[in-house]
Each structure stands twice: as structure tokens, then as C-alpha cells.
Regions:
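Non-catalytic interaction/regulatory modules that flank or connect domains
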Residues: 188-282, 286
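Conserved GNAT acetyl-CoA-binding A-motif
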Residues: 106-121, 250-260
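Conserved catalytic-core motifs of GNAT/GCN5-like acyltransferases
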Residues: 117-119, 135-155, 279-290
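A conserved beta-strand-loop-helix scaffold within acyl/acetyltransferase catalytic domains
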Residues: 5, 9-89, 120-121, 215-224, ...
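A short, well-structured alpha-helix characteristic of acyl/acetyltransferase catalytic modules
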Residues: 1-4, 11-27, 174-206, 211, ...
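C-terminal "cap" of GNAT-fold acetyltransferases
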Residues: 146-180, 289-317
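Glycine-rich acyl-CoA binding loop
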Residues: 80, 91-102, 108-109
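Conserved active-site alpha-helix within GNAT-family acetyltransferase domains
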Residues: 122-140, 150, 264-280
Length: 331
């Protein structure tokens, strides 16, 4: 007989059960240690940086967990986080129930957000399939983003792992989306599944005044450095060169720059990135509230495009496009 489960939002009262679920799979070795600390889990939820659901079995024992968290420059975006199922229930429908929680705005406490995204790993198909079933579309391909050695489950057979950026949109953006001429056709294709927005050609030149305004996330253990550029400023060429020099000093492998697509001079900013070796990654919808254009470079070796296992035709088309753009940069 099929096991019944009760799904409840995580709060300060039941947060003590989160660690129990993680221990059933990882022992005490899950790298994000706050999951074992009820007070820390409750604090993240209170600060609206985390939202999560627990599943309890018929006996009232914690059986599963799914979470979302905020990791984008736009605080109105949620990223699909961890899903953990006690091995006792691996053959049950619990994984599906937890995955479906991501579409339940009330249970997950995400009502009013701009959208939901995930970065689906490409050394197997499972996460990509789950994202597609949840109604997400593919918008970007982050080449060689993660270190393969960091995966104990579903061990990777490549040194680096790429990720597909999936997204589903809940609100309409208020700002226009500028697209560079060099990527116009692909950008328009990627934007099609989203809500209607004003799409304009980017023809403005780089500004002669103003300062670079950006946010960054540096993951030393993964060799990954991500930057979100709100404004390019007056010294964009020099800033890009300095970024590449610093990335080399840090032994970064995956360097990603998302540029605000609300900038009228986006095309000129992208052209400078291309001149210095960056190639196309895709679109990051609502990354700034407005959309973002992802440019990337793989340092220390050639990108492993062929190593990515891609589920959808969109992702496979995107790989061909990214690789062709990289080939142009190489020459």
C-alpha cells in the first residue's frame, strides 16, 4: 500500500527535523552545516533567504525535505535548493511530492516573487528532467561550472560539470530588454517563453562617465567566479582586463559575467567582453529585476562542450551556439 506523507512548511518549531533528514543520507557530512542547526535554519527562514518544506511519514517521522533560497542579485527570485529523501522512501512517490512543492506558492511561501530558477547539473539527466516537468524552460548553459570531484552521489565522469539554467517567470518586468545585434536571433528565441516584454536593439555606445557597479560570488573550492554587472561605467575595457588578470591569479576555471539587459549600451559592453575572450552563455531572465545576458570564459584549458549530457533540444541547440561563438573567440 502506498505510504501517505504530510507536507508542512518549515518553521522555528519543526526546524529541528531538517537535520534528521540530512543525516539519513549524508550523516553529519553535508557541506552546508547550518542544516543541522535548527536555530540557524529558522534564522535563514526569518530573514527570507530560505524557504523549505518537510515531509513526515504516517508515523510522524521526518522523511524528506525540499528547499529554495535567494542567491540572485534580484531578491525577488528563488533558486531551487536541496531535495533530500530518506533512503527508506526512495522507491515511494515522495520525491515527486517534494518536487511538486516547487509549484505550490502557498506551501513554499514564495507568492509575489518574480520567478523561480535552477541550475541543473549536466553529468546526468535527472535534475534537467525534473526542471522540465516543473514547467521550467532552458535559458543558458554554464560551461564547466562545477568541479566533478565535489559530487559523491552520481559521480561525474568528467573533470568539470556544466549546468543548464532553467527558469519559470511569475511577473512581468517593468524595464525594457536590450539585445546586442551579434546575438539578436538567439536572444529573441530564448526570450520567447517568457511574459511579454519590450525588446529593443542595443545601439548606444559605452558611457564616458560613471563607475562600474557589480556584485560577485566567488566559489574558491569550485574554481568558479560569478559577477553581476548592474552598470559598466567609463572604464569597462580596463575593468574586463583587470577581471581576467585577477581570475588567473585565483586559478579560476569558470568565469561568468551577467550584464544587465536594461542597459541601452549592452551591445557595446558585450562586444568588449568578446574582444577579451568571452563567449555567449545565454539569458538569465529577471536576474536584475530586468533580464541579464550571460557571457563566460573557461580558463586553464578548452571548454568541454561535448561532456554535457543535455535533456532538451533547446539546451542542445544552445550548446552548438555557445561552442560556435567560442570558436570565433579562439580564432
Amino acid at each position: 500500500m502506498e505510504q501517505d506523507f504530510q507536507l508542512v512548511s518549515v518553521d522555528a518549531v519543526n526546524a529541528k527535523h531538517v537535520g534528521t533528514v540530512f543525516r539519513s543520507v549524508y550523516g553529519n557530512d553535508f557541506p552546508i552545516q547550518y542544516v543541522y542547526q535548527p536555530e540557524a535554519v529558522a534564522a535563514e527562514i526569518a530573514a527570507e533567504r530560505l524557504t523549505a518544506v518537510l515531509a513526515f511519514d504516517a508515523a510522524g517521522q521526518p522523511a524528506g525535505y525540499v528547499s529554495m533560497f535567494k542567491n540572485a542579485p534580484n531578491f525577488q527570485l528563488w533558486e531551487v535548493g536541496n531535495m533530500v529523501v530518506n533512503p527508506v522512501y526512495k522507491q515511494s512517490r515522495l520525491s515527486l511530492l517534494l518536487a511538486n512543492c516547487c509549484q505550490n506558492a502557498e506551501l513554499m511561501n514564495i507568492a509575489g516573487s518574480d520567478g523561480l530558477y535552477s541550475e541543473a547539473v549536466c553529468h546526468h539527466y535527472m535534475t534537467q528532467v525534473g526542471s522540465a516537468k516543473a514547467g521550467m524552460a532552458d535559458y543558458a548553459l554554464e560551461i564547466d561550472q562545477l568541479a566533478g570531484s565535489s559530487f559523491k552521489e552520481h559521480c561525474a565522469d568528467t573533470e568539470r560539470i556544466s549546468c543548464v539554467f532553467n527558469f519559470i517567470e511569475y511577473t512581468k518586468p517593468s524595464l525594457p530588454t536590450y539585445i546586442p545585434n551579434v546575438y539578436e536571433d538567439m536572444a529573441r528565441t530564448l526570450l520567447q517563453p517568457l511574459k511579454k516584454r519590450d525588446i529593443l536593439a542595443s545601439t548606444a555606445v559605452l558611457p564616458q562617465q560613471g563607475n562600474l557597479r557589480q556584485e560577485e560570488k566567488y566559489y574558491e573550492f569550485a574554481g568558479t567566479w560569478k559577477l553581476a554587472v548592474w552598470e559598466t561605467g567609463a572604464t569597462w575595457s580596463e575593468d574586463v582586463a583587470a577581471l581576467l588578470a585577477e581570475a588567473a591569479r585565483r586559478n579560476v576555471v569558470s568565469l561568468q559575467v551577467a550584464v544587465n539587459m536594461a542597459l541601452p549600451h549592452l551591445g557595446a559592453a558585450v562586444e568588449e567582453l568578446r574582444k577579451q575572450g568571452f563567449f555567449f552563455g545565454g539569458v538569465l531572465p529577471r536576474w536584475f529585476g530586468s533580464d541579464g545576458l550571460l557571457m563566460q570564459v573557461v580558463l586553464g584549458g578548452e571548454p568541454n562542450f561535448a561532456g554535457a549530457k543535455l535533456y532538451t533540444q533547446t539546451a542542445r541547440t544552445l550548446r552548438q551556439y555557445c561552442q560556435a561563438d567560442w570558436e570565433l573567440r579562439k580564432t
